[in-house]
Amino acid sequence: MGKFSDIVKSDTPTLVDFYATWCGPCKMMSPVLDRLKDEMGSQVRVLKIDVDKNPDVSDKFKIRGVPTFILFKKGEIVWRQSGGMDINTLKNKIKQAL
């Protein structure tokens, strides 16, 4: 949990994708997140957390459905949403946090 805390405390916005390997919508979001990383580069950090392998982190943030996205900046949650979404929604939320 220490490394996770260090990452989300960064000045760079960090988008955390809480997902599961068995989740269909999570699989559909993978190429969207890859494209987001390509298009936004160093403006954002994307971190994927497998809820089944990391139940402690999932419990801490009360993850009840996947995918759930939480955007952190300087350790604070600035946005949170569950379910699949398009790249423009993600980009807009990240730009608001810059």
Give the positions of each predicted feature.
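Short pre-active-site segment immediately N-terminal to redox-active cysteine/selenocysteine motifs
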Residues: 11-12, 19-22, 65
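A short beta-strand-turn-helix
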Residues: 1-13, 55
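Typically the conserved alpha-helix immediately C-terminal to a functionally engaged Cys/Sec
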Residues: 27-40
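A short, hydrophobic beta-strand/beta-hairpin element that forms part of a small beta-sheet core
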Residues: 33, 67-78
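Non-catalytic, surface beta->alpha helical segment in thiol-disulfide oxidoreductase systems
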Residues: 73-98
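Hydrophobic beta-strand anchors of alpha/beta hydrolase catalytic cores
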Residues: 15-16, 46, 69
